[in-house]
């Protein structure tokens, strides 16, 4: 019985083609032909997709990968279909990448679809998209069926159009939840054929009596017996007009008593709803028995395929340590404020008064001849002017007046005062001296200093005269015998002439010389 059913399916599906192609189309259309996919282990979850989702998946099937046009793996020796994993990969990719967002609306279903795709890739591995296939001709090739050779001499063929459609339908059936499917229900509205909007102008309260159509009255000139066939069968309400024809005047009068005030309504739309329901059913045996019929072999072969589908869940925990460093740059704005307040007030007042009293001078007697001469010379000391001349008798005290200036600076708060003293000098009148040597600046010395200075000058003068006299003595007139008389310093034997007297190298000091400087000039230590 199964063999007969298989043969009928081959004839109807292949359209008169070879027996091999027909049998292979049945196997390729089954998703369970792929060893890494088992539809029984997947719980259906799609329920929010439209019914034409399969058309979208078929339309974008060939655009997913380069191998989608030749995705069926074939045995090189027996020319049997080994698996359709690549075809199933193309269908899942078309559903996930190209059609789901346009035909489905649930985010939870999309997340479940991602899990199915990931599990399929883990089980079957990553399919190679860059594999180069070369065409290969054989006796099974035809205009619709082509074979290709890939790496390691693997043989592939293209899926036929009905094989691809059946594979997509079987895949969506295994993923669709039939109990919650609402994608097959389409609701639409049927609008009036003429697309006209009709208004309700006047009608009676009972709604049974309808007024004649306005267009009908205009076309028939008030003939009430004629009806326009194009308005039959439609529910339309038109504005009622007064009829001027005589044939309708009686009926109008009879109906005038039963009519009441007419109302105006909003426009109405007439819609109709059609519901189409489609149910999908499938038979899923636990074991699949596939019969392959090949012309070269007369004996049938029974192949039992065990499909395994593994679910692997991997949890990965990643610890991340974030180290950040922050650099801050501060700008310092120095602020310097200097407050200077100076207040100086100086007041200086000095008054100096100098009074010179009359100094009595006496004549000193100095012995100029150490050998006993009786010649004496008198020296008078008095007060003289700065130029060495005697002061005039009429010269009295001369006052000197000096101004006092005051300098004031308001900004520095400093006040200075400069004082110039006023000095009154008075020189007494002294008698005029006739002889003697005069020494200037004696008016600045008191009595004791003056006497000490005079004695010092006298002693120094005598010593210098003694040395000078000793050095000027000539010994050429005396002999050795006269050596006893060398110590004889009697006055009778020594005579002094004017050549033995000469002036000392002592300069006359000016007015205002100090005592130390005067002693230095005189040679007194």
Swiss-Prot record:
* Residues on Cytoplasmic side: 470-525
Q: Cellular component GO terms, alphabetically?
A: membrane; mitochondrion
> Where does it primarily localize?
membrane
Q: Which residues form the signal peptide?
A: 1-21
What name is this protein filed under?
A: Uncharacterized protein YKR005C
Q: Does the keyword Transmembrane helix apply?
A: yes
According to the record, the residues making up region (Disordered) are 242-264
**Listed transmembrane segments:** 449-469
Q: State the compartments where it is located.
A: Membrane
The stretches that face the Extracellular side, renumbered to this chain, are: 22-448
């Amino acid at each position: 019985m199964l063999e007969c059913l298989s043969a009928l399916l081959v004839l109807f599906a292949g359209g008169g083609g070879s027996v091999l192609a027909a049998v292979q189309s049945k196997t390729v259309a089954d998703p369970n032909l792929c060893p890494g996919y088992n539809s029984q282990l997947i719980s259906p979850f799609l329920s929010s997709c439209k019914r034409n989702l399969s058309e979208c998946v078929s339309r974008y099937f060939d655009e997913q990968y380069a191998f989608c046009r030749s995705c069926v793996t074939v045995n090189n020796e027996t020319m049997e279909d080994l698996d359709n994993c690549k075809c199933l990969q193309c269908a899942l990719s078309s559903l996930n990448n190209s059609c789901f967002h346009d035909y489905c609306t649930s985010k939870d279903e999309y997340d479940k679809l991602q899990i199915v795709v990931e599990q399929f890739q883990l089980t079957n591995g990553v399919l190679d998209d860059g594999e180069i296939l070369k065409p290969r001709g054989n006796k099974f090739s035809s205009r619709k069926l082509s074979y290709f050779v890939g790496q390691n001499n693997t043989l592939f063929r293209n899926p036929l159009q009905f094989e691809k459609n059946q594979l997509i339908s079987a895949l969506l059936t295994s993923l669709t939840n039939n109990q919650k499917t609402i994608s097959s229900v389409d609701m639409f509205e049927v609008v009036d054929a003429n697309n006209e909007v009709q208004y309700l102008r006047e009608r009676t309260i009972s709604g049974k009596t309808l007024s004649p159509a306005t267009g009908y009255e205009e076309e028939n000139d008030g003939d009430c017996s004629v009806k326009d066939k194009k308005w039959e069968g439609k529910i339309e309400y038109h504005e009622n007009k007064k009829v001027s024809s005589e044939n309708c005047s009686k009926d109008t009068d009879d109906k005038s008593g039963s009519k009441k005030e007419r109302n105006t309504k909003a426009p109405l739309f007439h819609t109709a709803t059609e519901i189409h329901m489609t149910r999908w059913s499938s038979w899923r045996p636990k074991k699949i028995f596939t019969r392959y019929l090949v012309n070269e072999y007369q004996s049938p072969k029974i192949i039992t395929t065990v499909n395994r589908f593994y679910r692997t869940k991997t949890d990965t925990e990643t610890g991340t340590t974030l180290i950040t460093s922050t650099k801050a740059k501060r700008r310092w704005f120095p602020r310097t404020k200097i407050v200077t307040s100076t207040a100086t007030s100086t007041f200086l007042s000095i008054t100096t008064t100098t009074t010179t009293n009359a100094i009595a001078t006496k004549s000193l007697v100095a012995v100029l001849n150490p050998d006993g001469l009786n010649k004496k010379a008198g020296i008078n000391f008095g007060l003289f002017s700065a130029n060495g001349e005697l002061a005039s008798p009429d010269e009295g005290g001369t006052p000197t007046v000096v101004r006092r200036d005051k300098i004031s600076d308001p900004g520095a708060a400093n006040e200075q005062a400069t004082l110039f003293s006023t000095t009154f000098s008075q020189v007494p009148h002294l008698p005029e001296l006739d002889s003697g040597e005069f020494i200037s600046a004696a008016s600045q010395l008191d009595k004791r200093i003056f006497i000490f200075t005079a004695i010092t000058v006298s002693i120094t003068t005598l010593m210098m005269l003694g040395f000078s006299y000793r050095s000027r003595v000539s010994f050429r007139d005396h002999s050795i015998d006269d050596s006893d008389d060398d110590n004889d310093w009697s006055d009778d034997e020594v005579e002094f002439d004017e050549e033995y007297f000469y002036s000392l190298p002592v300069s006359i000091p000016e007015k205002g010389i100090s005592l130390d400087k005067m002693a230095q000039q005189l040679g007194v230590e």
